[in-house]
């Protein structure tokens, strides 16, 4: 039950991220890759007081082992599961964690990874504010699919710090491009694809909520990041303000059922019943999760550089 919940939540987070750090498919092999994701969130405008997390594949830790000494040396007699998964309590402003429940997926099958915006999408705050999603029509594509979790970039659209409204520059002084994550699989038809992405690019003249330096324009080149039909398992970086997890209280099946609520608010239905023919007694646990996206631009997919 817990494993299924972790996998489902990780998939939801992967698809609903708005940020990207690193080159798609490049392994994280240095702590600078982790710190870079933290720098991305700080530059975007994530509050410095927020806890920031970097969730990585267990094998990634082997690449970082040489730099691990002393990062988490303090150890009590009893440690929680969270503490056991923790690699570093604060590295580059990030809490680095390891997880075997990261979501992997196969990228879309289209080998044509470049297209053009057929028309300028709606980039107003009023349209995006409730979902932080945006619809774009991409043309001049080939055939195949664009998969949920694939990320796109639009030429000439770069990120702003949402607090200062200043252009974000990376370590080399280059502008950081805006990235959107495709929310559901799309089949290309007639060389066109209509995609809905998380982390909408918002731009209005003198707009107080702008998060990019220019609105996506008709004819702008759209790049689908990564290679076609390739298995990816991105690391995740995020803050507590990015996503929410709750549960739905399930009705009892019989009067003898129990609906328990954990200390952190998780509702679990417990049903106890018997199989007379098999002479066995069984207990069933049911949990119905509910996920929410608070701000996709406070989370991202992480790779190496």
Q: What is each PLM-predicted segment?
A:
Residues 2-305:
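Core alpha/beta structural scaffold of self-assembling particle/tube/pore-forming proteins
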């Amino acid at each position: 039950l817990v494993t299924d919940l972790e996998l489902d939540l990780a998939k939801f987070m992967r698809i609903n991220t708005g940020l990207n750090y690193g080159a798609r498919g490049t392994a994280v092999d240095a702590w600078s890759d982790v710190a870079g994701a933290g720098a991305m969130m700080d530059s975007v405008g994530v509050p410095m007081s927020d806890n920031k997390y970097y969730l990585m594949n267990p094998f990634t830790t082997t690449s970082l082992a040489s730099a691990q000494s002393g990062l988490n040396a303090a150890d009590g007699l009893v440690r929680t599961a969270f503490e056991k998964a923790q690699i570093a309590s604060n590295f580059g402003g990030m809490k680095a964690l390891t997880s075997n429940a990261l979501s992997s997926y196969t990228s879309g099958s289209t080998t044509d990874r470049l297209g053009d915006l057929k028309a300028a999408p709606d980039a107003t705050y009023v349209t995006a504010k409730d979902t932080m999603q945006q619809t774009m029509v991409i043309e001049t594509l080939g055939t195949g699919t664009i998969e949920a979790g694939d990320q796109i970039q639009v030429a000439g659209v770069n990120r702003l710090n949402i607090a200062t409204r200043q252009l974000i520059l990376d370590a080399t002084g280059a502008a950081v491009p805006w990235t959107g994550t495709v929310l559901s699989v799309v089949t290309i038809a007639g060389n066109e694809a209509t995609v809905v992405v998380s982390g909408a690019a918002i731009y209005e003249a003198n707009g107080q909520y702008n998060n990019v330096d220019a609105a996506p324009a008709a004819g702008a080149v759209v790049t689908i990041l990564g290679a076609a039909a390739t298995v990816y398992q991105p690391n995740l970086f995020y803050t507590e303000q990015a996503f929410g997890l709750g549960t739905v209280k399930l009705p009892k099946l019989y009067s003898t059922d129990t609906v328990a609520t954990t200390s952190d608010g998780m509702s679990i239905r417990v049903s106890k019943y018997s199989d007379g023919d098999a002479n066995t007694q069984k207990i069933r646990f049911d949990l119905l999760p509910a996920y929410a996206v608070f701000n996709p631009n406070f989370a991202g997919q992480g790779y190496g550089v």
